[in-house]
């Protein structure tokens, strides 16, 4: 009996690329999934290597122009957005590797989100409010930070993970797990403990959830 291959989209959003904690944790999760009998097909979207276009007036105008009226230039402008949305639609599992920058997400990730949140494509409005259109997916947020924003006194400063959860829910993805790798700048012992705990959580996700 064969099991259908699951498609995994890994979105890396650290500008430090190969020296990124969140990226390394995403790679660790991929390695754990590869050790399972279930087959996975991985797509890596590294926003440091291929940044999403910055949302400007030309993009805004192109997004709200009917498809049949798009000029050749506008077709080129909307091409990255359509590619990103197709990747979301075809993925079974979406992994967002997200370092915290100034209490929120990176500029790279914000530009990507501006490209995928499109009315009629990833969400729509009706009488009862918005409805997400990217349904039936699982998502994992890997949140890394130099400080520890998991404590009672600090968690209110974390604008990263609540925002990402909201965006995912908004476009229809409600099955979301978050793995934290916080305290990486608080000394070697704290960093080692956080890394070990995150790896354990990722192993558990790979074995029991994904």
Please report, for each region that a protein language model flagged, where it lies by residue:
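Cofactor-binding loop segments of dinucleotide-utilizing enzymes, especially the Rossmann-like FAD-
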Residues: 13, 144, 181
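N-terminal beta1-alpha1-beta2 submodule of the flavodoxin-like/Rossmannoid cofactor-binding fold
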Residues: 2-98, 103-114, 118, 200-210
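Gly/Ser/Thr-rich active-site loops/lids in small-molecule metabolic enzymes
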Residues: 116-121, 162
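Short, well-ordered alpha-helix to beta-strand connector turns
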Residues: 91-92, 136-137, 173
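Residues at the starts of beta-strands that form the adenosine-phosphate
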Residues: 6-7, 41, 137-139, 175
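Short histidine/acidic/glycine/proline-rich micro-motifs that form metal-
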Residues: 15-17, 147-148, 185-186
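Short, glycine-/small-residue-rich phosphate/pyrophosphate-handling segment
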Residues: 125-170
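Glycine-rich phosphate/pyrophosphate-binding loop and the adjoining helix
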Residues: 2-3, 151-210
């Amino acid at each position: 009996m064969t099991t259908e291959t699951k498609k995994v989209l890994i979105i890396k959003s650290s500008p430090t690329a190969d020296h990124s904690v969140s990226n390394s944790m995403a790679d660790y999760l991929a390695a754990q999934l590869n050790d399972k009998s279930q087959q996975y097909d991985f797509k890596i979207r590294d926003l440091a290597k291929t940044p999403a276009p910055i949302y400007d007036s030309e993009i805004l105008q192109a997004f709200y122009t009917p498809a049949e009226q798009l000029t050749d230039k506008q077709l080129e402008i909307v091409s990255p957005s359509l590619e990103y949305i197709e990747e979301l639609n075809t993925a079974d599992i979406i992994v967002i590797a997200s370092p915290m920058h100034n209490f929120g997400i990176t500029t790279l990730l914000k530009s990507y989100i501006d490209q995928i949140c499109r009315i009629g494509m990833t969400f729509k409005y009706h009488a009862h409010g918005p409805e997400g259109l990217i349904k039936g997916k699982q998502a994992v947020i890997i949140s890394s930070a130099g400080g520890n924003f998991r404590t009672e006194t600090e968690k209110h400063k974390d604008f990263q993970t609540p925002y990402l959860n909201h965006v995912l829910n908004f476009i229809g993805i409600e099955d979301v797990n978050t793995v934290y790798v916080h305290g990486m700048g608080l000394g070697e012992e704290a960093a080692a403990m956080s890394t070990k705990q995150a790896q354990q959580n990722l192993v558990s996700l790979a074995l029991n959830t994904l």
